[in-house]
């Protein structure tokens, strides 16, 4: 496993410990990717996982671009359409560094 895969596994475990239910991971389409799909009661949660081994370039929180946000949103819309679902949903970010994890809920 590479560091990104390890970070996604750690994020999944963390979210499950917070009471979320795992649905899917690494959902890829030509126009975007979703790292984790979780559920919190009836809300579907699309999670982008960002990991940085240091804060040299602003850390994990600064690693998400507007282009990436657009691609994640498109992928989530496509996923829901393919599954024929129309649930309430939100977009979260798990920002991880070597020694901390930050869960930002509903951040885009």
From Swiss-Prot:
Gene3D superfamilies: 3.40.1350.10. Pfam families: UPF0102. SUPFAM superfamilies: Restriction endonuclease-like. Belongs to the UPF0102 family. This is UPF0102 protein Sfri_0388. GO terms for molecular function: nucleic acid binding. It comes from the Bacteria. CDD domains: PoNe_Nuclease (cd20736).
């Amino acid at each position: 496993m590479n560091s990104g895969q390890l970070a996604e596994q750690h994020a999944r475990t963390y979210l499950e410990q917070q009471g979320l239910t795992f649905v899917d991971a690494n959902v890829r389409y030509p126009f975007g990717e979703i790292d984790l799909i979780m559920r919190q009661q009836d809300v579907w949660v699309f999670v982008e996982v960002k990991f940085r081994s240091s804060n040299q370039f602003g850390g994990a929180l600064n690693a998400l671009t507007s282009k990436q946000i657009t691609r994640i949103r498109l992928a989530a819309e496509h996923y829901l359409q393919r599954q024929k679902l129309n649930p309430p949903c939100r977009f979260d970010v798990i920002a991880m560094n070597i020694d901390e994890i930050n869960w930002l809920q509903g951040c885009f």
